[in-house]
Amino acid sequence: MTTFQYSLVFLVLMAVIVAGDVANVTYDGRSLIIDGEHKILFSGSIHYTRSTPQMWPSLIAKAKSGGIDVVDTYVFWNVHEPQQGQFDFSGSRDIVKFIKEVKNHGLYVCLRIGPFIQGEWSYGGLPFWLHNVQGIVFRTDNEPFKYHMKRYAKMIVKLMKSENLYASQGGPIILSQIENEYGMVGRAFRQEGKSYVKWTAKLAVELDTGVPWVMCKQDDAPDPLVNACNGRQCGETFKGPNSPNKPAIWTENWTSFYQTYGEEPLIRSAEDIAFHVALFIAKNGSFVNYYMYHGGTNFGRNASQFVITSYYDQAPLDEYGLLRQPKWGHLKELHAAVKLCEEPLLSGLQTTISLGKLQTAFVFGKKANLCAAILVNQDKCESTVQFRNSSYRLSPKSVSVLPDCKNVAFNTAKVNAQYNTRTRKARQNLSSPQMWEEFTETVPSFSETSIRSESLLEHMNTTQDTSDYLWQTTRFQQSEGAPSVLKVNHLGHALHAFVNGRFIGSMHGTFKAHRFLLEKNMSLNNGTNNLALLSVMVGLPNSGAHLERRVVGSRSVKIWNGRYQLYFNNYSWGYQVGLKGEKFHVYTEDGSAKVQWKQYRDSKSQPLTWYKASFDTPEGEDPVALNLGSMGKGEAWVNGQSIGRYWVSFHTYKGNPSQIWYHIPRSFLKPNSNLLVILEEEREGNPLGITIDTVSVTEVCGHVSNTNPHPVISPRKKGLNRKNLTYRYDRKPKVQLQCPTGRKISKILFASFGTPNGSCGSYSIGSCHSPNSLAVVQKACLKKSRCSVPVWSKTFGGDSCPHTVKSLLVRAQCS
């Protein structure tokens, strides 16, 4: 062989090694097909921009351990192209690094390119400069929009291809999404909307990724794109694929819901999520994505209007990346049970059998020795049914999974997974006035502003999304000083009013009602008076038709002076975009030196004050959080990086702040002397109440009945599938407890085998109780990082109350 031939062979081998294993991804009416093999896939949404590169490996590893096969993420256009033609893929924006990290863990990727994503993200992910393109109308058959959408989509796909990230190149991306929930707005555009959908599908095909494309909430998604479902109950609400040759895909199964300021959080139980996933699988669903699996943090100004900084904290992995139990563990067991059924589910015929008015059996299998069944009870009451000559007690509103059509391996209403208690502990108090310095914004006068208009300007058009804040000022003559009333009709989100430099009041809207009327009494000078209004946005809109037409800000300004009304809509107004502290970047070390700071003084006479202090990083590896419970409204920075907006003073209807703790990723921190800067808009904020906290799981609890199935054994080395899953139907259910890494069970706080009252949140000994409960559990668990206790009378020395369904409830402390 010649030297040239050796070189050629070497290059070919290197190309194969670099590319990895090329996969052929297709689909039929049952599921996605990867290299000729049908797959049931569980996916979890983890957004690279809502965490940090340092967190990615742990998040992905925990997702894999929880039975996730696919990591799903949006691609954020406004993050990657904040200015037209200027691209940024650095730091937490490094999507290539994120996808490669997913591949390193042996998982697939679903890439949701959008480019409109909604996602409670500023402007739905669209860059604001797009708003300024002449003649543009978003998300319809509009040439300027289509031009930029195509240019962006091609750029992202080209980037993915250049890194060999599609499965057709040996990469992990097996599925892509174009557009997002267009069915929610399509009617507003009528025929142009239908044309846009067809054009979008054609664009996706032309991008030639070698993997299938989906459109969610788009019932008429053109071939070959697959229409997919979003929502909490797709097993009940999804009409199904629009072609018999397309699989049933659930792109967003909401594990909780995003929270807005002033609204209570929506808590969704592990049992409810599992029920609807199992029901979707029973009805031939084959791909389920949890939105979110890890929500993370809306750092900076990335949250959309009125959305809090913490995002989907109730997901299986919480905001800090800690396991949210029992949600994480219960879904892991569900995934394992379904994987036990994968072969008959995908290769067998489905038969539906009525077991009662609200009870149904879905049976899968071609052969007698290859059979799986899913028993569904839609009733709110327990039901006993007969199936294949055996009796089954079905819990209320539950689904039972029978991998062999005989034995129950999993029931959605019976939780074997432990419950966790998350605790925040103050590590450093910033309570000394000597620790703080302050700098107060000055209220600009008309003559100090650089933008002039003879009418009221719209907020977003003026700020161009460079700041949440817009000053609008004017001056007028008053012949005599007199009590007067200022009336401002405002389209949100908040407004602070000043007359002659004095603060006279504030008002704000809500997520559901942006518009409000600020009406404040004031005293005017005899002669010239200066009126200054600070319009404040709390995130850009992110959904609905015609985003490019949205307006925010003052719509009318009036002053009643006791005799007549002055109208200011067509007065000369001066405008200033942003605050002085923003202009000088006072939240950075260099910018901080550009203004004159003063020693903190306990004065609440003026809002719009910047505070700065320094703190040392808490020891250990527990997540770090900033407790802002003593503050009002504003934004916080650590070492120049924004950890997000806060609005502690906006309480829910139950009287609670929407959010108190704000995540500081450890990668933002230095060992010592971290710069903390707070912008406080309101007068009531007190920085002396701020603490630096750590977050950890300090208590674990298990509550398992002797009627529960034994947990599915799932050795998680190469992924969940039938080959590496085993199940022993003769084994007893058990309580399993595990402390976080580095901690052990130090104390048993409660233990009762029998009929304990309550649950892990609130409990007491019931009428039936084994006196050996505490001793048995202490022997099995104390000084161990993990333990298990069989829920069986023999474990506790006998049955003191026969013919009674018993359970074991254990609560333990981790130290």
UniProtKB/Swiss-Prot annotation:
Tissue occurrence: Ubiquitous, with higher expression levels in siliques.
Superkingdom, taxonomy of origin: Eukaryota
Keywords: Apoplast, Glycoprotein, Glycosidase, Hydrolase, Secreted, Signal
Pfam families: BetaGal_gal-bd, GHD, Glyco_hydro_35, SUEL_Lectin
Subcellular location: Secreted, Extracellular space, Apoplast
Catalyzed reactions per annotation: Hydrolysis of terminal non-reducing beta-D-galactose residues in beta-D-galactosides
EC code(s) of this entry: 3.2.1.23
Residues of the SUEL-type lectin domain: 729-815
GO-annotated cellular components: apoplast
Record field: transmembrane: none
Residues spanning the signal sequence: 1-23
Major location (coarse): secreted
Disulfide bonds: none
Glycosylation: residue positions: N24, N253, N284, N302, N389, N429, N461, N521, N526, N570, N724, N757
Active site: E181, E252
Annotated GO MF terms: beta-galactosidase activity; carbohydrate binding
A single BP term in Gene Ontology: carbohydrate metabolic process
Family named by the database record: Belongs to the glycosyl hydrolase 35 family.
Protein name: Beta-galactosidase 16
Native species: Arabidopsis thaliana
Lineage, broadest ranks: Eukaryota, Viridiplantae, Streptophyta, Embryophyta, Tracheophyta
